[in-house]
Every structure is written in structure tokens, then in C-alpha cells.
Amino acid sequence: MRTDTPQAVNLADYRPFPFAIETTRLVFDLHPTRTRVSAELSVRRTGGKNEPLVLNGERLKLVSIAIDGRPLAAGEYGVDAERLTIAEAPDAFVLTTEVEIDPSSNKALMGLYMSGGRFCTQCEAEGFRTITYFPDRPDVLSRYSVRIEADGKFPHLLSNGNPVASGSLDGGRHFAEWSDPFPKPSYLFALVAGDLDVLADKFITMSGREVALRVFVDPGQASRAAYALDSLKRAMKWDEEAFGREYDLDLFMIVAVRDFNFGAMENKGLNIFNSSLLLADPQTATDLDYERIEAVVAHEYFHNWTGNRITCRDWFQLCLKEGFTVFRDQGLSADMRGAAVQRIKDVRALRARQFAEDAGPLAHPVRPSSYLKIDNFYTATIYEKGAEIIRMLKAILGAPAFRKGCDLYFQRHDGEATTVEAFIACFAEASGRDLSGFFGWYEQAGTPSVTIETAYDAAAGALTLTLTQSTSPTPGQPDKKPLPIPIAIGLLAADGRVLRDTEIVLLDQAQMTVRWDSIPEPPVLSALRGFSAPVNLSTDARPSDRYVLFGSDTDLFNRWEAGQTLARDLILTRAAGAPDEVGEERYADALGRALVDDAAEPAFKALLLALPSEPDLALMFEAADPAALHAARDHLRTRIAVHLGDLLRRLHGEMQINGEFSSDAAAAGRRALRNACAEALSADPHAENLARLLGHFGAARNMTDMIGGLYPMVAMGGVPREKALESFHHAWRTEPLVLDKWFAVQGRDPNPDALERVIALTQHPDFEPTNPNRLRALVSTFANFNPARFHDPSGAGYAFLADEILKVDAFNPMTAARLVEPLGGWRRYKPELGDLMRAQLERIVAHPNLSKNVLELASKALG
Ligand code: ARG
Ligand code: ZN
């Protein structure tokens, strides 16, 4: 048994920090193994007379400490593994500390570490405390000035704010000084030092100020940063137009690093990115990479207002910046790439990640009230469901009142660290609405289930809708209350004509009825249009109603949704042993008609052609059997490939683009549809299709087509798989981002020998477990996206994942913890599997020296 039970942090225990840190002066003397950091904090007491000054600090070697220049004697302060305490601090003073740290041994990639021979930092959420002693909490805002000294081998010395001085020093060393005029919390501090190439540009803001833009990348990679730089300019413009937000410093910098625990980080004026979300050219990046780069560059830039100018009072308020900022980046993507297609992709991701989380032992409210490690709460719930809540707020208030609320928030809370309550209060005030019930969305975990029953009275020409909602219990929340759910509803006639336009019905009780008159004929219900709320909807619709929606709903989201629901029901029925052959034919016919609709965009058709994923299907199942689902889904794939073979081959040919590559949404849509056709045809691998697929892979001139061709080759197994993987590896062995794709495609390999091969790949010379991208490409792809092989009846897939978690936890707890989730759903699987999953969680929890990160998630998963 472990004796050191970690302490939970509770929202209810929030207390302001009893001191203000008005200015923070940092001097870095950089050295790979012995970096000196001296900090000069001007401290002023704001709380009670007897409050001690307690600063966070971990893994620091304290070299000296002084108050107002006077070194402290041993009895005047205390240091332990997590903090520095000065019991009797004056009311106003300057505290100077000097510490030594070792960036090169830092494989947790938090704080100051080295990547590719360069220094870089990641401080959110609690990394700053491994750099210097400081109140490392988001509500302590300070003005920073930074001096960096380093060897000439590190030519670029970067930090937040504006550059104020630079020059050379003795012994081949040099320095740079930076000053950030905006008070900020420590988690937004950043430093980068090293040899980098830079791509430069400028942006003129709406008030006419010129901002210098710089993107720093590995030497030789500057051309690959052009798309990110262009995305940045579009994001800056969009934020001015959509939210009236202007950039505030004279300089905005982005740096790409290869070793990074997550996507990117919004440090003030100096964003740091995982290189996988920054570098792109047609040869090495897929359209999905381009799409994500556009979204993440925007996301981090948007944080400058939603996160940096207005930050979080404490980490329980994380959704205040993350949910709002995801909402904002989704808005940009919708404007750049088409609202319907973007919405479908966002909802697909929401269901795959957030609905799964909300349905399992790791379910938590968008604003949680307790945690062990805040790093475990950078979840789909905080981010994606957090964004859905803002989207509902906008739907309920209407766009003008929503914008007024945003303006009020920006004006009232600028320069503050605030709360979700304060944010919602701005919308209540701006709209004059009572939003107290709405707040339940932040406090209640779980995905609500909504049912709608319809009764049509032909004589009266009236339709009665009976709407009900309920939410199942989640850990720690046995009883759920009704939430205000905006449900966008329209009506179609049986022949697809519009009978009634979209209207938002606000379901804010457990049950309510709505009566609509003047409905001249029996209607087909199109409910939850645009996925107007993050709920599971069930209605009394018959398959024939769904075919009406699939064929003609004006709401493209619901058109897609109808197709998915039809396919899902057919797969689940077959997996349960009662196949509906006639229904499968009918579905394939309707899909064929949708694919030849000239009015629909290729990107939309590509989405229609993608069947519901296996993990999504498993969510719909009690006691899920991944093998049966895989087989049933494959059966429908084959049925479609056979039934629509001619059409799919024709489209595959027509969508081919000859001529120059364009990364725009229209061209990407054509490539997506062509790849979807290839994927579909691979389910019927006769000679003609095989030749076509080989041609697709062999002739690919960009990475989107290449990956679209590689997966079917891998899925075929045998000689095509070996040959394709070998030629791909040979071509790309020196490009880390492309090699990640090579590992990922093998993580998704559906062949029966995939697990064995994945385990063997962990011994491949190119497998670098200390690099999170490489690790996730193989291990996380396998565990999350290859259910048929991960859920091997022997339990070997689970044991493999547990082995990897324990190995990685020894040096990078944060990345290890993110691998726990696939085991967390054990209760949803059939008991033979669930028991084996649980056994691996028990093995993990029993492991000595487990990190708090993994301990928290694995023990919660055991429930
Ligand atoms: N704030 C960053 C973003 O969303 C992510 C930081 C993740 N930090 C963490 N400890 N998981 O853009
Ligand atoms: Zn963010």
C-alpha cells in the first residue's frame, strides 16, 4: 500500500495569494546541464500580517537567497521538495534568489528543457516552479523583464514581450534583454535559445499599428513555415472582424520544437508549437495537417485575449480560456472552410473523445471542483464541451446579444484573473436574461439524453412534440437536474420539401410539450439541426423518415447525421446477429444517390462515405464486442464497395487533380473524396480495384494522396503491405514528421498480426519513446483507433499498453497519463474483456513510484 496519499486541490479552498509580485526580473545564464537562474521579485504584502511567504519550487538547487540585498541566514527560510517558505516576511521588499537547474536531463518536457539542441520552455500549468521559486498560480500577475546569456552556439535568445537590448559578452557569449509590459501569470512565461531559421512578415492592425511577425524553425525549414505564417495573418484579421480584438505588442513570435507534450502554447508574444502543428508543405503534410495548423495557430493567437489579457483565477476555471478559445478557433475554421463540413468534423471529434469521456469513470464537469494533478484536466470535456457551452449560449441569446456580452467581458475584465461566474454574468447583463440555470452546464458532468416523440393530428393540422431529458449518474454526481438545452428543429414533407423552417426550442425542464399548428401534411422531423446541443438524441423516426433527411434535409449536418444513424443501426443489428440485408441494399442505394448530387461539395461527400468509426459504435453498445463490431462494419463496407463499385471508381478518377498543388478547402475536398473512394474500394480487393489502389499509391505526388494510398496497402497485408511500408520508409527516413505517419499507419493496421507488429516496432531504431509525437503515433494510435486489435481476446493489447504507460511514466508522467484513457472504458466492454482491462489498471496502480498523474487517472478509471 502506498502511504503518501497525494493531496487533492479543491475549488472551495481558493484563497487569494497574500502578496503581490509587482515586478519580476529574471536572469538566465544558460548551460545545457548547469543553468543558473536568478530572480528578483518586488514583493508587497496584500493579505494578513502573519501570513508567511510561500513560493513553489521543485527540482531546484538553491544557490543564494536575499531580502533587500541581505543574504538570509539558515533559520530565516525553509526549503523542501516543493516549496520555499519565509515565515516572517516584511511588508514590502525585494526577494532575490539564485538557483541551478539541469535542462538537458529534463525528459518530462515541463519547465526549461532541451529539444534538438535548443533550449525551450513549457510552463502551463505548473512548469515555472521548476525554473525558479515563485507563486506559480494563475492569479499572481507580474511584469516581467528577462535577461538571457548564452554561448554563441545559441544565436537566437527569445522571451516574452519586446526586445530591449542585445550584445556580446566575453568568451564567445552573448546576451539579450526582453521586457513584457503586460502583467502575466507565470504559466505564460517562455524562453527559447538556439540556432533557428526565421520567416519574417508584418501585420497592420485595425488601428494602423505595425506588428512584426516571426516564425522560428529548425535550420533549413523556413519554407515549411509559410502556411503557418499565412494562417497567423488570417487569424489576426479574423479576430478583429469577428470579436473586435486587436493585437497589443509590437512583435509576435512563434517557435516550432520537435519535443513537446501537447499541441502548442500561447505564451505572451512567444507561442511555442509542436512542430507537427506548424510545419507544412505538400510533400510532407496532409490536408488534415494543414487544417489543424490553421486552427491551432488561430487558437494560440486568440488566447492573447481569451487567456492572456484575461486569464483564470485558478485552474478550475480552465474552460474560461480553453472552451472560449476553442469556440473561437472553430468559428474561424467554419469561415475559412465551410460551416457545415466543419461542424460535422467538430461533432465527430466531440463524440469520439468527449462523449466517451463523459460516459466513463473519468467523467467530470466542464468546471471541475477537485483534482490531484491539473495536467490531467486538459481534457476533451474542458476544451470541446467547454466550446459547445459557448455555442449554446450564442444560440440562446442570438448573435447580437452574444457579441454585446463578449464586448462587456473584454472591457470589464481586461488585465484580470477571473472566473466562469464573472464571464456568464457579462452575458446575463448584456442580454437582460437570467442565466442561472444555464450555469448547470458547467457544474454537471455527463451527456444528457433527449427524446422527442411526435404526434400528428391530421384533422387539426397540428403537430405535438413531447421532449424529455435525463442524464445518467456520473462519478460523485448521482442526481442530475434538467439543463436548458437549445434544440433547433425544422420540418420536411415526405417528398423532401421544406414544411417549416428552423426554430430553436429551449428544453429547460425534465419534460415539455410543444404544439405547432398549420402543418398541412404528416411531417418528417429534423431535430437538433447543426447539433445545436451536446446531447444524445433519440426520436420516434422510422428508417423511411431518415431516408427523407438523408436525401434532402436543407440542414447538411442532419443530412449527414441521418446517413450515419442508418449505417450505425445496420452495423449494430448485424453485430447483434440479426443482419438486415434489405436495409443494407437500401442504404447503399441512397448513399449512391447522395454521391452523385451535383449540388453537394466533395468534402461533404467524403464525410457521407465514411462509416461511423468503431470506437463510436462501441459507445452505442452495452457490453461491447469489438471483434463483432469490426466484422459487421467491414461487412457493410464490402456491401457498399460491391454495390457502388462503378460509381466509386468513376468518382475516384474524376476527383484526381492534375496540375499544381493547392492547400485550399476546395482542392482538399476533392482529395478527401478521392481518398474516401480508395478506402471504400479496398473493401472489395479484386484485380481491378487492386490495380487502381496500387496506381493511387504509386502515383501520389503529395502526402495526402500518399497516406490515402498507403493505408489500403497496409490493410491488404501480405506483399503489398511490406512493399509499400518499405518504400515509404526509404523515401522519408530523414523526415521525423513523416516517419510519425509511418508509425501511425501501422498502429491502425487492421490485420490479425498487427499487435505483434506494433510490439516489434517499439524496438525499431526509429522508435523514440522520449519523443511524444513518435510515442503517440504508434502507441496511442493503436490503443485508440485500432479496437479490433487492441481488444485482443488474450488481453495482450492491454498488457502492451500498460507496459508502455509504466515505461514512459518513469520520465514523462504527463504523456504517460494521456495513454491511460483507452483502458478507462473497461465497464463498457463484454466482461471477458473488461476484466482483463481492469487487471491492467490494477497492475498500474500497484506499481511503485507511480506519478501522481498516472495514479489519479488509473485509480479513477478503476472507480
Ligand atoms: N494552453 C495550451 C492550449 O490549449 C495547452 C497547454 C496544455 N498544458 C497542459 N499541462 N496539458 O493551447
Ligand atoms: Zn488553448
Swiss-Prot record:
PROSITE patterns: ZINC_PROTEASE (PS00142). Its cofactor is Zn(2+). Pfam families: DUF3458, DUF3458_C, Peptidase_M1, Peptidase_M1_N. Its EC number is 3.4.11.2. The record marks Y383 as: Transition state stabilizer. It comes from the Bacteria. Zn(2+) binds at H299, H303, E322. Keywords: Aminopeptidase, Hydrolase, Metal-binding, Metalloprotease, Protease, Zinc. The keyword Lipoprotein does not apply. The active site is at E300 (proton acceptor). Substrate binds at E124, G263, A264, M265, E266, N267. Binds 1 zinc ion per subunit. Disulfide bonds: none annotated. One of its GO terms (molecular function) is metallopeptidase activity. It catalyses: Release of an N-terminal amino acid, Xaa-|-Yaa- from a peptide, amide or arylamide. Xaa is preferably Ala, but may be most amino acids including Pro (slow action). When a terminal hydrophobic residue is followed by a prolyl residue, the two may be released as an intact Xaa-Pro dipeptide. Aminopeptidase N is involved in the degradation of intracellular peptides generated by protein breakdown during normal growth as well as in response to nutrient starvation. PANTHER family: PUROMYCIN-SENSITIVE AMINOPEPTIDASE. This is Aminopeptidase N. The lineage of its organism: Bacteria, Pseudomonadati, Pseudomonadota, Alphaproteobacteria, Caulobacterales. The gene is pepN.
